[in-house]
Amino acid sequence: MDYPQQHIKPYNEDGKKTEQVERMFDNIAHAYDKLNHTLSLGIDRSWRRKAIAWLRPFRPQHIMDVATGTGDFAILACRELNPDELIGTDISEGMMNVGREKVKKEGLSDKISFAREDCTSLSFADNRFDAITVAFGIRNFEDLDKGLSEMCRVLKPGGHLVILELTTPDRFPMKQLFAIYSKVVIPLLGKLLSKDNSAYHYLPDTIKVFPQGEVMKGVISKTGFGEVHFRRLTFGICTLYTATK
């Protein structure tokens, strides 16, 4: 199926969205962590903890963190869940290089590894992982259905999927406040801290049109997952989706 965010590209150039997303994240990798925590006022850490708390009872030993970026979620998941193996995948080597340094400093290089992967064409075998996580990256998929289908393919039967994604609040006054914040504050801070003006216009543009709530639940369900649920966090600014294969 065709989704609006798939046509939004960071630099509005001809060519594949994936290539532009890769270039964008390579460009902002040096400032990404600072921006992420600043723009969310640090609340993103609590969102990650809620996602990991949902996984904890299942004790997954082999985890893939898709769109791992600089490895924030991977590091926290490794510390909290203590899996045998955690592979962070991303298309941006710039982001993963930052992640590799962080993992080394944390002393987790024996548990966490990184691999350059296109989420719509994963190189892993079927039924490979106990759990798959995606934190704030699924909006960037060039083909949402294909990406979800690939994650379902490499997840073991009975395995679990956890997605965190930024969403638009649907109630007054947060809806109006978030609209102003995303239209004015996010692009301004993004330009000041990352020096990439396009990246932080792209972010609110994709949040606005990305499937959310019941619609996203349906998208996940049709790609092979069951027991799909969602929970809105912090007045709907973020949504946690969970599913089982």
Curated annotation (Swiss-Prot):
Catalyzed chemical reaction(s): a 2-demethylmenaquinol + S-adenosyl-L-methionine = a menaquinol + S-adenosyl-L-homocysteine + H(+)
GO MF annotations, alphabetized: demethylmenaquinone methyltransferase activity; methyltransferase activity
Q: Which BP terms in the Gene Ontology apply to this protein?
A: menaquinone biosynthetic process; methylation
Residues making up the signal peptide according to the UniProt record? none
- What class does this enzyme belong to in the EC scheme? transferase
Its keywords, alphabetically, are: Menaquinone biosynthesis, Methyltransferase, S-adenosyl-L-methionine, Transferase
Q: What does this protein do?
A: Methyltransferase required for the conversion of demethylmenaquinol (DMKH2) to menaquinol (MKH2).
Which HAMAP family does the record associate with it?
Answer: MenG_UbiE_methyltr
PANTHER family in UniProt: 2-METHOXY-6-POLYPRENYL-1,4-BENZOQUINOL METHYLASE, MITOCHONDRIAL (PTHR43591:SF24), METHYLTRANSFERASE (PTHR43591)
Q: Which family does it belong to?
A: Belongs to the class I-like SAM-binding methyltransferase superfamily. MenG/UbiE family.
Its name, as the record gives it, is Demethylmenaquinone methyltransferase
